[in-house]
Curated annotation (Swiss-Prot):
Gene that this polypeptide is encoded by: IPK
GO BP terms: terpenoid biosynthetic process
NCBIfam families: IPPK_Arch
Protein name in the entry: Isopentenyl phosphate kinase
Species for this entry: Arabidopsis thaliana
Catalyzed chemical reaction(s): isopentenyl phosphate + ATP = isopentenyl diphosphate + ADP
One Pfam family named in its UniProt record: AA_kinase
Family listed: Belongs to the isopentenyl phosphate kinase family.
Residue(s) carrying N-acetylmethionine: M1
Keywords: Acetylation, ATP-binding, Cytoplasm, Isoprene biosynthesis, Kinase, Nucleotide-binding, Transferase
């Protein structure tokens, strides 16, 4: 795999955060952002990035018109000589949710075949959709004073070979971090050396970022409390939250809390028909590979007190009994 990454790459990365598409968009409404959740997530990220620093005035960085507004919100007159906030180093990656998946699944982009007009059109349509979402997430975080920079994998030189990452410009990501910005990447339609094209999921992107940037911990923000032994729903009221999953040296994993025999490697996955990225099964698989690197992974419901504690890094030494989520960590 070709990785463009300089020797002076950014070290001391504190956290990589995955914003699950289902948590920040309305899954049953095409291209609809869950504004309330996204606003809370942006606020929680700001608090986590300040790492115990005294709260400072939020200097919004989105100086563009918003839909339904006739004015531009610009805090430039308030900035003056004010000392900038010292944010710890975070990277954000988000999924597509109700953006992109519809276009990709209807056209078969994930299967490849750019010579087909429907696939080529779907490739364009998918990228329009996911880059629109990326812009709105960048704007939401910027309104919280977080210096975000949207970075699309396709435009940054990411490509695949039979769906495995073949090249990635990680040097640009590292330089962006070292310059004091927060990169915001996303799942994207990319070129594939064998298939012609495919979908590169945000979960796969995070694994490669974690491998080369070596964060202290990784947080997956989802629309459920964590990983269950079966999809939680009104028809499955007895679904069990798996609080800790241990990953072995060979990459295999097992549930260690709670100690339920039937959960070991027998988790029942549920994937929506339009989801071209593999759903929870892919998430656990990629999280296990990250944990194998010695990096703890927390899967937790977005916009909750549980997600704030995970983002803050409060769980690294000990996990309170009242914390709800799933921890995936390496176990020798």
């Amino acid at each position: 795999m070709e990785l463009n990454i300089s020797e002076s790459r950014s070290r001391s990365i504190r956290c990589i955060v995955k914003l699950g598409g289902a948590a920040i968009t309305c899954k049953n409404e095409l291209e609809k952002i869950h504004d309330e959740n996204l606003e809370v997530v942006a606020c929680q990220l700001r608090q986590a990035m300040l790492e115990g620093s005294a709260p400072s005035k939020v200097i919004g960085m989105d100086w563009s018109k918003r839909p339904g507004s006739s004015e531009i919100s610009c805090d430039v007159d308030d900035i003056g000589d004010q000392k900038s906030s010292e944010f710890s180093k975070f990277v954000v990656v988000h999924g597509a949710g109700s953006f992109g998946h519809f276009q990709a699944s209807r056209s078969g982009v994930h299967k490849g075949g750019l010579e087909k007009p429907i696939v080529k059109a779907g490739f364009v349509a998918t990228r329009i959709s996911v880059t629109n979402l990326n812009l709105e997430i960048v704007r939401a975080l910027a309104r919280e004073g977080i210096p975000t920079i949207g970075m699309s994998p396709f435009s940054c030189g990411w490509s695949t070979s039979k769906r495995d990452v073949a090249s990635a410009d990680l040097a640009t990501v590292a330089k962006t971090i070292d310059s004091g910005f927060v990169p915001v990447l996303h799942g994207d339609a990319v070129l594939d050396n064998i298939l012609g094209c495919t979908i590169l999921s945000g979960d796969v992107i995070i694994r490669h970022l974690a491998d080369h940037l070596k964060p202290e911990y990784v947080v997956f923000l989802t629309d459920v409390l964590g990983v269950y032994d079966r999809p939680p729903s009104p028809s499955e009221p007895d679904a069990v939250l798996l609080k800790e999953i241990a990953v072995g040296e060979d990459g295999s994993w097992k549930v260690v809390n709670p100690l339920l025999e039937h959960t070991d490697k027998k988790v029942d996955y549920s994937v929506a028909a339009h989801d071209t990225t593999g759903g929870m099964e892919t998430k656990i698989s990629e999280a296990a590979m990250i944990a194998k690197l010695g990096v703890d992974v927390y899967i937790v419901k977005a916009a909750t007190t549980h997600s704030q504690r995970a983002l803050n890094g409060d769980l690294r030494d000990s996990v309170p009994e009242d914390w709800l989520g799933t921890i995936i960590r390496f176990s020798k």
